[in-house]
């Protein structure tokens, strides 16, 4: 695929995510039945955090595309480094995690993660925009251009830190309101919740390594860019 086509792809997907980040929080804003959905903002839902993350990543990717054409590759090392770090450690693992976990729980017992009553407010296309298309968009990014992966220690540490921060957010929300962000947690014992969180990190770490394998399979070994020291 040509560089122009890749730039166009980034621009189109960026605008798609900008639209979703604006449109979805507006759904049923004045509906009493969706009061719990809107209380606490988007930061309590991993799905909505992921949509915001994808918008940020594709925004950085677009900026990288434009600057490379305007001022040249050598002058924007930091932007390229940040783009790759964001995609490899967060954007790809998180979008794949949301896709796999949501649909696994949905087909097992949808009431654990997406109660049927939400269908009255969220059309099917919105559900798929939040939980399905995120994966092929990220997968396409892995095959459109190579990404320099950081060391496993750095990559998995950043991923782990973000996992831990979100767990704290979930627990803090529960302490404040007495309600779990996702119904699945209400069906688990304290030990079950600990095991769920542990399994979630193991899965997300595995997806990080999976993304690295895809990158190596498609592009071969890549040289990690070194940041210049002052």
From Swiss-Prot:
Lineage: Eukaryota, Metazoa, Chordata, Craniata, Vertebrata
Entry function: Hydrolyzes bioactive fatty-acid esters of hydroxy-fatty acids (FAHFAs), but not other major classes of lipids. Shows a preference for FAHFAs with branching distal from the carboxylate head group of the lipids. Regulates the expression and the cell-associated anticoagulant activity of the inhibitor TFPI in endothelial cells (in vitro).
InterPro entries: ADTRP_AIG1
Protein origin, superkingdom: Eukaryota
Class of this enzyme: hydrolase
Entries under Pfam families matching the protein: Far-17a_AIG1
Protein name: Androgen-dependent TFPI-regulating protein
Stretches that traverse the bilayer: 8-28, 46-66, 86-106, 121-141, 156-173, 191-211
Gene Ontology molecular-function annotations: hydrolase activity
Listed GO biological process terms: cell migration involved in sprouting angiogenesis; cellular response to oxidised low-density lipoprotein particle stimulus; cellular response to steroid hormone stimulus; long-chain fatty acid catabolic process; negative regulation of blood coagulation; negative regulation of extracellular matrix constituent secretion; negative regulation of leukocyte cell-cell adhesion; negative regulation of leukocyte migration
Catalyses which reaction(s): 9-hexadecanoyloxy-octadecanoate + H2O = 9-hydroxy-octadecanoate + hexadecanoate + H(+); 12-hexadecanoyloxy-octadecanoate + H2O = 12-hydroxyoctadecanoate + hexadecanoate + H(+); 9-(9Z-hexadecenoyloxy)-octadecanoate + H2O = (9Z)-hexadecenoate + 9-hydroxy-octadecanoate + H(+); 12-(9Z-hexadecenoyloxy)-octadecanoate + H2O = 12-hydroxyoctadecanoate + (9Z)-hexadecenoate + H(+)
Site feature location: Important for catalytic activity: 47, 131
GO CC terms of this entry: caveola; cell surface; endomembrane system; membrane
Subcellular location: Cell membrane
Primary localisation category: membrane
Family assignment from sequence similarity: Belongs to the AIG1 family.
Bilayer topology annotation: Multi-pass membrane protein
Spans within the Extracellular topological domain: 29-45, 107-120, 174-190
Gene that encodes the chain: Adtrp
Record key words, sorted: Cell membrane, Hydrolase, Lipid metabolism, Membrane, Transmembrane, Transmembrane helix
Keyword flag Ribonucleoprotein: no
Cytoplasmic side stretches: 1-7, 67-85, 142-155, 212-230
EC number: 3.1.-.-
């Amino acid at each position: 695929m040509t560089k122009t086509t890749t730039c166009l792809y980034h621009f189109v997907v960026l605008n798609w995510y900008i639209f979703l980040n604006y449109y979805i929080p507006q759904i049923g804003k004045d509906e009493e039945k969706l009061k719990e959905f809107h209380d606490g903002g988007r930061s309590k839902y991993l799905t909505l955090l992921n949509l915001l993350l994808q918008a940020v990543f594709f925004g950085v990717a677009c900026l990288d595309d434009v600057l490379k054409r305007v001022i040249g590759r050598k002058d924007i090392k930091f932007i390229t480094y940040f783009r790759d770090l964001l995609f490899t450690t967060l954007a790809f693992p998180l979008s794949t995690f949301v896709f796999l976990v949501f649909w696994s729980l949905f087909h097992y017992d949808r009431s654990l993660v997406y109660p049927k009553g939400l269908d009255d407010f969220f059309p099917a296309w919105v559900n798929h925009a939040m939980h399905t298309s995120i994966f092929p968009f990220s997968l396409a990014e892995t095959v459109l251009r190579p990404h320099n992966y950081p060391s496993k220690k750095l990559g998995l540490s950043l991923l782990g830190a973000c996992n831990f921060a979100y767990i704290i957010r979930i627990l803090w929300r529960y302490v404040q309101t007495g309600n779990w962000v996702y119904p699945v947690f209400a069906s688990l014992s304290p030990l079950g919740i600990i095991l769920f969180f542990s399994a979630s990190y193991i899965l997300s770490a595995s997806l990080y390594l999976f993304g690295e394998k895809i990158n190596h399979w498609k592009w071969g070994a890549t040289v990690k860019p070194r940041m210049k020291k002052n």
